[in-house]
């Protein structure tokens, strides 16, 4: 087994062109230790499958978002990859169905298989959902205790959390009351909780309605008055992703809205520096208290020279025993229904991490049907990008909120026309 960190030059050039007929390239990004764990379990796979060599190319997440689609369009992509644009890359996917037990896959992965499909009528098997995620807040409980402020309880609203986090920050001199990752996916749950529908009556994607506008107004206002850590959104251009995990880890941030994939990182890097916990997504004026589901999956690409070998690798990772091991070692929520029903004994997880994963799993019941539909919508990547770019322009003052919303509408119309 070989695990490699790709340089910028290698990313631009692509990772295709295997040196031998037995070599497969697996483009992988990690939220925590996922690529390291895959490298380890695939070493065992190689021992059982002489002549197959799976090289794990570790890349930044931004490379998955930006470089991989370019490589695939040029025909220079890897054999398989860990992706998050599940439906958006469907045109490049290898259909695993001819090579795997479809009954096992359908019973094990259920509805998540639809997130990778082209749409109604497509029954192909394209991706193994490797980690189920849900967005939600991490809270610095130590800062609340030091401030003598009671933490809002179940069913608390975004306004109540903003007021409490601000009070805590002022009492403790913490740098930032709140932050939300710079991501269209991350703000979708809050927007839905404010009443955003995200689809029109015909089921086509739409961004701007009264609910979305209400959230946009409030989010921009919070960035202007210091409730939100402004530089998370204002410090980047275009639709570039930016999280605020380090600010939270450093103890500078009271309330951090991100997601379950961060649990392993928090467990490892916060340690006993302070007490942290996960709470349910706050509620909005529309009565919803929704996060966004999502996650990552491992897919093969039709341009590979070795489709049967690629399918064999992914099928191995999808086996219940291997999937359960990877889930336990990476501290992720399982999308495999058999693994989920059996329960996961998370490896070396602290009490805080175990409680956090339990809290995230429990909050899945509060996820709006709109959020599940949005996650599976093939046009969501364009909508995420438009959201980030135009909201950021409103935050930095390049546009008013009204102008930003107008641009979102025209941007989405153009994107949908281009995709036809």
Language model region names:
Residues 22-31, 52-57, 79-80, 126, ...:
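Short, well-ordered beta-strand elements
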Residues 24-40, 59, 133, 375-379:
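Extracytoplasmic "Venus flytrap"
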Residues 32-53, 387, 405:
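Short, polar/charged alpha-helical segment
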Residues 47-48, 147, 224-228, 268-337:
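Extracytoplasmic/periplasmic substrate-recognition and gating elements
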Residues 84-134:
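Hinge/lid segment of periplasmic solute-binding proteins
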Residues 165-166, 204-237, 267, 281:
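Glycine-centered hinge/linker elements that transmit conformational signals in sensory
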Residues 261-264, 300-381:
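Mature extracytoplasmic/periplasmic domains
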Residues 355-413:
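C-terminal capping/gating helix-and-loop segments adjacent to ligand/active sites or protein-protein/ligand interfaces
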């Amino acid at each position: 087994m070989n695990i490699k960190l790709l340089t910028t030059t290698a990313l631009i050039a692509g990772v295709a062109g295997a040196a031998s007929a037995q070599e497969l390239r697996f483009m992988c990004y990690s939220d925590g230790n996922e690529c390291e764990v895959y490298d380890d379990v695939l070493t065992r796979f190689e021992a059982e499958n002489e002549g197959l060599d799976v090289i794990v190319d570790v890349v930044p997440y931004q490379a998955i978002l930006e470089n991989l689609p370019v490589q695939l369009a040029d025909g220079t992509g890897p054999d398989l990859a860990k992706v998050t644009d599940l439906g958006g890359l469907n045109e490049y996917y290898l259909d695993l169905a001819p090579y795997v037990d479809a009954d096992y896959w359908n019973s094990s992965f259920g509805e998540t298989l639809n997130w990778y499909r082209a749409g109604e009528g497509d029954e192909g098997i394209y991706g193994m959902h490797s980690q189920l995620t849900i967005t939600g807040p991490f809270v610095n409980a130590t800062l609340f205790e030091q401030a003598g402020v009671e933490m809002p309880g179940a069913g608390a609203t975004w306004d109540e959390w903003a007021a409490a986090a601000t009070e805590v920050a002022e009492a403790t001199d913490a740098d930032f009351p709140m932050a939300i990752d710079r991501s269209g996916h991350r703000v979708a749950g809050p927007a839905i909780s404010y009443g955003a529908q995200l689809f029109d009556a015909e089921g086509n994607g739409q961004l701007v309605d009264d609910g979305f506008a209400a959230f946009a107004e409030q989010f921009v206002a919070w960035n202007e008055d210091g409730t939100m850590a402004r530089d998370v959104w204002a410090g980047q251009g275009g639709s570039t992703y930016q999280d605020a995990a380090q600010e939270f880890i450093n103890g500078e941030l009271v309330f951090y809205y991100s997601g379950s994939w961060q649990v392993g990182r928090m467990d490892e890097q916060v340690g006993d520096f302070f007490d942290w916990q996960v709470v349910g997504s706050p509620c909005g004026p529309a009565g919803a208290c929704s996060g966004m589901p999502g996650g990552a999956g491992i897919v093969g690409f039709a341009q590979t020279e070795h489709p049967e070998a690629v399918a064999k690798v992914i099928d191995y990772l999808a086996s219940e025993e291997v999937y359960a091991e990877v889930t336990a070692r990476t501290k992720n929520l399982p999308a495999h229904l058999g693994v989920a029903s059996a329960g996961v004994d998370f490896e070396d997880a602290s009490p805080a991490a175990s409680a956090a994963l339990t809290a995230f799993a429990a909050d899945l019941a509060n996820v709006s049907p709109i959020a599940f539909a949005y996650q599976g919508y093939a046009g969501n990547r364009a909508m995420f990008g438009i959201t980030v770019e135009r909201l950021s322009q409103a935050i930095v003052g390049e546009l008013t909120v009204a102008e930003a919303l107008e641009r979102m509408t025209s941007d989405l119309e153009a994107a949908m026309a281009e995709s036809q």
